[in-house]
Structures are given as C-alpha cells and as structure tokens.
Amino acid sequence: LSEHFLCLTRWDLMRDNTLRFKQPARIRKNSHDAWIFKPPLPAKMLEKGGFYMGRPGCDGMVVYLATISGLKVFNPSEVVKAKHLHLSGHRTYGRRHRMGRDDIYMCVFPNDKIEFDPSKLMYKFGDPRQRAYGEEAIQRALDFEFGNEKHWYYAIEKCLRL
C-alpha cells in the first residue's frame, strides 16, 4: 500500500440487512466515505488537511489532496465493501455546509480492481462543465495547485466557522 490511497464508496446497510451500493444514477455518484492508506501520510496532506471529516465536499477534497501529494488514488469499492451502518435519515449538516468549490475537488470512480487506474480519476475545474479525466486530471490538479490556494483556505475557514 505504500504510495497508494484507497477511497471507498460506501455500501448502505438497509433495514432488511441487505447491502445497497451508494452509487445512484444522479446523486452522490462520486462519494468516498472511507479511506485506506499506509502511514505516514505525505506532509502536504497533513499540513493542508485541517478540516472536519463528514462535511459535504470533504471527500472530494481528500482525493484532491492525496493526488497533489503524489499518492496513487483508486476506488476498488466493487470488491472492497465499506459498510455504512446509519439507518437514520438525520444529518447534522445541510447544503450550506458544503466545503469549497470544484477547483479543489477530485473524484475517483469505483471499479472492481485493487490497482491504480488513472482513467478512473476526474477533476472539475473553473467552470463546472470543464472536466479532465485520467492522467490529464492529475496534471491539471498539479498545474492549478498554487492558483487554487485561495479556494483551499476559504474552504478551511468556512469549515471551521460553521
């Protein structure tokens, strides 16, 4: 696992004890709810990672941070199942708690392989309709890293004051 970072999309445990993959057609199709890595994390992740987990948007920020820190990010959620044991619909957050903006979010789509596949990465930047995939996504995130600093610090401040 050295230099790898697994981001897992959750499987919801339903009231009848069945599991449902949390990848609906339109909503939250790119969520990551659990992470597996071999410590220590890169210094950049520790320095910039001062935000609360569980806030809307934090999962995309974690993927972005891992990517710009040089880790190989992948999501083998079709074979590694992170079970979500939260049957209540109650949440302590809403849309206004969303952290950041697209420039500091990345997504890694689920698959059935336990190996790095850059084609599963997506980065939205600038206008939300601009997207890059694969190696281009990694390169764009690295190219825009310093220009995105203001977005990053705004997201951290917002997280800490809500």
What are the language-model segments listed below?
Residues L1-Y64:
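Conserved catalytic core of nucleotide-sugar-dependent glycosyltransferases
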